Amino acid sequence: MSSGKIAQVVGPVVDVVFASGDKLPEINNALIVYKDGDKKQKIVLEVALELGDGMVRTIAMESTDGLTRGLEVLDTGRAISVPVGKETLGRVFNVLGETIDLEAPFADDVNREPIHKKAPAFDELSTSSEILETGIKVIDLLAPYLKGGKVGLFGGAGVGKTVLIQELIHNIAQEHGGISVFTGVGERTREGNDLYWEMKESGVIEKTAMVFGQMNEPPGARMRVALTGLTIAEYFRDVEGQDVLLFIDNIFRFTQAGSEVSALLGRMPSAVGYQPTLATEMGQLQERITSTKKGSVTSIQAIYVPADDYTDPAPATAFAHLDSTTNLERKLTQMGIYPAVDPLASSSRALSPEIVGEEHYAVATEVQRVLQRYRELQDIIAILGMDELSEEEKTLVGRARRIQFFLSQNFNVAEQFTGLPGSYVPVAETVRGFKEILEGKHDHLPEDAFRAVGPIEDVIEKAKKMGF
């Protein structure tokens, strides 16, 4: 184990010099430094660059407070390795695989895997066309998720990405019954804490591994924690042959952390100040999130859109890797429609008659056509009013508004805030409900009866209570 000394500390970036003749650590190797020589105060560094003359530049996985020039640094000879396998289920840990749930740490002999790996080869990949039912009407109807696919939840600040991801965990993890891995990347610690206790109460935690590198942690931890979660998911897929659900909240913070350290590593900033290696870093992460012939990884990723600008390089780079996109729209939150999923901007390659069936496809495309026509008519309505529309257009507008409200739904995870019980709607019920609205069977019911309900029977029941 070769050793060097700290030459310079600039925030999360630490330069380490090794004596001439000593073997230099490889890129991505983990180095260990003890604060003040205290074996309990260990800081892990990861080699990012080799500068020449025995000098390497590293990124710290923990705060560099207390580090001084001249402290001894040891090369472990391998990349950061984290615990994998059944021992990780029901546990919460950090980027280094250290437990943070106040329970006993992992045993020394626990199976460990390095967080840096190559993506599976082409001939190992599997192509599945099986739909993953979420129980959320707007998603199942218009932008269905594929089992073993990659899903992005796009939205600006405060439009409901985390609530939607928590509802998906509630619905899919309980229905799916398989193994889930939740990775919190640079998000609020409070949300992670709430999610942990919620999962503990529902019993889902027994089949879930949780990894966190939250907002208050150094960029090194936020940059690598997604790889830690992915490594655990890969083990369950490749070694145990399981179908795994991988939740990542939030992929943008992974990019943001890379951007924070990029300039300190001496790289020239690229578009909008992002790192020049943005596409490469995103590709290395996303290409590993895939399904092989041994098992599948279905990933659901929340992606923050800065200032609601979808042309920003961070969300734009993520777009290219996804099978389905669920776009959350601020205007819908202002109308009180939750989940605020934009039915026209959201898309999925699974929405084809070969995968979802002829009836589902026909209903979904007709719903989109009606909503698109309504959007076109809104300018006329705003300027001239409803009276200037033809009878046919008035009928279409009425149905479009009912469809728009019927796309909203109460969530189980939001019950404590709304006081209304959540609902899980099977795909067949969803398709039937929208088909009946399109056929005009419920034109006589008030629009408000369609707001925040489950299946179409709930609408009829709600309308009766309103006196219709």
Swiss-Prot record:
Record: residues binding ATP: G155, G156, A157, G158, V159, G160, K161, T162
InterPro entries: AAA+_ATPase, ATP-synt_VA_C, ATP_synth_F1_bsu, ATPase_a/bsu_AS, ATPase_alpha/beta_chains, ATPase_F1/V1/A1_a/bsu_N, ATPase_F1/V1/A1_a/bsu_N_sf, ATPase_F1/V1/A1_a/bsu_nucl-bd
Gene3D superfamilies tied to this protein: 2.40.10.170, Bovine Mitochondrial F1-atpase, Atp Synthase Beta Chain, Chain D, domain 3, P-loop containing nucleotide triphosphate hydrolases
Keywords tagged on the record: ATP synthesis, ATP-binding, Cell membrane, CF(1), Hydrogen ion transport, Ion transport, Membrane, Nucleotide-binding, Translocase, Transport
Annotated compartments: Cell membrane
CDD domains per UniProt: ATP-synt_F1_beta_C (cd18110), ATP-synt_F1_beta_N (cd18115), F1-ATPase_beta_CD (cd01133)
Assembly with partners or alone: F-type ATPases have 2 components, CF(1) - the catalytic core - and CF(0) - the membrane proton channel. CF(1) has five subunits: alpha(3), beta(3), gamma(1), delta(1), epsilon(1). CF(0) has three main subunits: a(1), b(2) and c(9-12). The alpha and beta chains form an alternating ring which encloses part of the gamma chain. CF(1) is attached to CF(0) by a central stalk formed by the gamma and epsilon chains, while a peripheral stalk is formed by the delta and b chains.
Name of protein: ATP synthase subunit beta
Origin species: Streptococcus equi subsp. zooepidemicus (strain MGCS10565)
